[in-house]
Amino acid sequence: HVKEVALGENGIIEGAKPGTVLIDMSSIAPLASREISEALKAKGIDMLDAPVSGGEPKAIDGTLSVMVGGDKAIFDKYYDLMKAMAGSVVHTGEIGAGNVTKLANQVIVALNIAAMSEALTLATKAGVNPDLVYQAIRGGLAGSTVLDAKAPMVMDRNFKPGFRIDLHIKDLANALDTSHGVGAQLPLTAAVMEMMQALRADGLGTADHSALACYYEKLAKVEVTR
């Protein structure tokens, strides 16, 4: 979709004047960002890839994290524009680096949710109140932003999407494709993506990614509740 908007018929490449800067805040494959940037540059159009993290709550309150790839001078010029909607804006390297950073972010989030789901399912199956387990561990080394955001959702059975499983599958697929291209191995990412695909097959593709817990609950025949 981004390629079509940028390079397609009646796209940015056909209408934008030289000197225009495209700040692409979507989450796409790093290779796609580089290809789009190269085509635009031939027409005198610069580009930053600037995906965001934080989900709907941080978008609403203007505290998103923005990770940016592209020319540093262009980044500096438009920093204040991006900072107006963000809590942090970090230049991570050349074009495509923003989306590599976003993929790394999505890997960490997915694996955190999976680990949380395993732990709370274990507690529930062992007859221990998962809410008390959560309260006990959240202040220690196992505590995290993901744990605090997603554990209450699971225990309240609130899977209203802040970030849908469908979208996380897309990001993990891009992470795996990128890893194959650079020769990295992501075995845990591959495993979690299979779990999410199974949930999508069960009709949970539009649920919040915290519904990953349902995969573990189904195996253990329990429900993680307060």
What feature does the model see in each segment?
Residues 5-6, 22, 27-106, 110:
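Rossmann-fold dinucleotide-binding core
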Residues 1-9:
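Glycine/threonine-rich flexible loop motifs
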Residues 95, 99, 143-210, 215-216, ...:
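Interdomain hinge/lid region at the active-site interface
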Residues 12-18:
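Short, conserved loop/helix-junction motifs that constitute active-site signature segments
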Residues 129-138, 190-194:
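Beta-strand segments within the central parallel beta-sheet cores of soluble alpha/beta enzyme folds
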Residues 61-69, 90, 94-126, 135-149, ...:
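Active-site-proximal catalytic alpha-helix in oxidoreductases
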